[in-house]
Amino acid sequence: MRVLLTSLPGIGHLFPMVPLGWALQAAGHTVLVATDREFLPVVTGAGLSATAVLDPVDPVELFKPVEPFGDPLSPAERTGHRCAEAGVRALPAMRALVDVWHPDLVIAEPMELAGPAAATNAGVPWVRHSYGLIPPGPLLSVAAEVLDAELAVLGLSALAKPARTIDVCPDSLRPSDGVATVPMRYVPYNGPAGVPDWLLAGPPARPRVCLTLGTSLPRRDPHVAPLWRLLLDELVALGQEVVIAIDESHRPLLGHLPDGVRAARIPLCDLLPTCTAIVHHGGSGSTMAAASFGVPQLVVPHFADHFTNAERLTAVGAGLSLPHDTDDLARISAACELITGDGPHRAISRRLADENARRPTPAVVAEGLAAEQRSMTPA
């Protein structure tokens, strides 16, 4: 089976799909990722073959808020518009790739629409692959409406519904939305990186907390440092061993670090099993990785799906949330003390990890896709 993976050129969009790509390859299937030239090394660094056929697009721009005055669309609907427009721009190159490569199946993350549109118009079934919580209905419906209107102008068929939707979110974390899905275990992948000796040296002497701003937030907002510095100082004051997972290029944002605080590019999949808590921005990669390891989460959401992730973690009791513009030291201190303590959020976080571990592995899902591919038809 020839499988084409399509994703926006963003780590948070592609990396959750990588384990399924590996599983398909290991089962003997041919996997190709469609991307742009700048993102090509990221894909190939994950051990997947890729072709640079797309024009560059910055996923951060798709989620950038607009001034509310005069804009009748909600943030989710506005993002849906932008995703559809990006899909239309990428469609000619994606159709050309599908025509020459002849995939048997296209697998796309929710924000990438050129792959599904090209698959639809080539009579190829496509599958949606979530990267966390499934995006809100208004986002997906507006994206489909805008895309279908553009496809009609081009004389092309409207977007077919996905033949399957692969869901990597634990059931109790995901809101009830009635969407039928194929459950799959979330397997954290954070890119190639060396593991430092100190991380392999056994349990830490003090409780260890991971602090991370993710990959997109420092690029989008270089002025995030003050609140994160307050969080860092409070965690240190509580006697925690703080490890900051951050790209080296963003390291200067944090200024001089207190003694004993480490900051480096460390994969969360290696760091989190040693941690008692994580403080992060609410991105799906950090949220899902922490959930998969049963680590309580303190979330400071800034944009896009950060808010939804924070709301769901708070609702199920697996985490806490702070507004990104707070400077209330008492509130910050209380949140840090709670998330590093032994409250009920610790048992609930462990339950999320247990739920994730019971889900079918990517290898099992890959086997199912191969068995069912011939019966999938674009709807």
Curated annotation (Swiss-Prot):
Single GO MF descriptor: hexosyltransferase activity
Disulfide bonds: none
Alphabetical list of InterPro entries matching this protein: EryCIII-like_C, EryCIII-like_N, Glycosyltransferase_28, UDP_glucos_trans
Biological-process GO terms, alphabetical: novobiocin biosynthetic process
Activation and inhibition: Inhibited by TDP-L-rhamnose, the sugar donor that most closely structurally resembles the natural substrate dTDP-beta-L-noviose.
Chemical reaction(s) catalysed: dTDP-4-O-demethyl-beta-L-noviose + novobiocic acid = desmethyldescarbamoylnovobiocin + dTDP + H(+)
Enzyme class: transferase
Annotated pathway: Antibiotic biosynthesis; novobiocin biosynthesis
This protein's UniProt keywords: Antibiotic biosynthesis, Glycosyltransferase, Transferase
Enzyme Commission number: 2.4.1.302
UniProt cross-references to Gene3D superfamilies, sorted A to Z: Glycogen Phosphorylase B
Function field: Catalyzes the transfer of L-noviose from dTDP-4-O-demethyl-beta-L-noviose to the phenolic oxygen of novobiocic acid, creating the full ABC ring system in the novobiocin biosynthesis pathway. Novobiocin is an aminocoumarin family antibiotic that targets bacterial DNA gyrases. Also shows activity with variant coumarin aglycones, suggesting it may be a promiscuous catalyst for noviosylation of a range of planar scaffolds. Does not show activity with TDP-L-rhamnose.
Family the UniProt entry places it in: Belongs to the glycosyltransferase 28 family.
Name of the protein described by the UniProt record: L-demethylnoviosyl transferase
Organism: Streptomyces niveus (Streptomyces spheroides)
Gene assigned in the entry: novM
